Amino acid sequence: MELALYLLPVTLGDTPIETVLPPYNKEIILGIHHFIVEDVRSARRFLKKVDKGIDIDALTFYTLNKHTSPEDISGYLKPLVEGHPMGVISEAGCPAVADPGADVVAIAQRKNLRVVPLVGPSSIILSVMGSGFNGQSFAFHGYLPIEPAERAKKLKMLEQRVYNEHQTQLFIETPYRNNKMIEDILHNCRPQTKLCIAANITCEGEYIKTKTVREWQGKTPDLSKILCIFLLYK
């Protein structure tokens, strides 16, 4: 296999590997012994899911999350510089997209090291695909403010971008606060604004539905403790 930093997508939940990841990914994974991961425990679990016979103890893991210092991140690429292929694994979905993995990819690019993204599920892309919204211009904002007044202000700002820039707006919430997020959207956005709720993407019980804010009133699903993305458009 080629010497490179491989970006290795992960399933979005308990989805069987074969339904969302091509066999080529497994071939690449089995040839790597150095992994940069967001969470070691979930990475080990994913690798065992890819191949039960994989020798986890023979692998080296480097933790990359929001607490990792820039100095540590730069040092993580030493095996790659020395001639060993490396892999980047997020907790879910595609690494380096709304994910700390982007930091190590940026360093690899600066060092002129080969970077190879592999095919796999992205909740951001899949939710845009399933929403019926503008897929040529969209923005993902991560988590919105928790404080009510700030959240209301942010929602109105995102909604304004929908109408001014014709741009799809995406954001997420901690699962146990999903229902409150829906309440806030319905309270602060215009009746004609469209809201897509995309939950459990690629998993059992997948739910992707688009309606206007007016149509959602009094008819929202219970999304507590479910991974979900919210999308706004017109």
Language-model-detected regions and their locations in the chain:
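Glycine-rich, flexible N-terminal cofactor/catalytic loop recognition
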Residues: 1-64
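Conserved helicase motor
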Residues: 62-69, 144-148
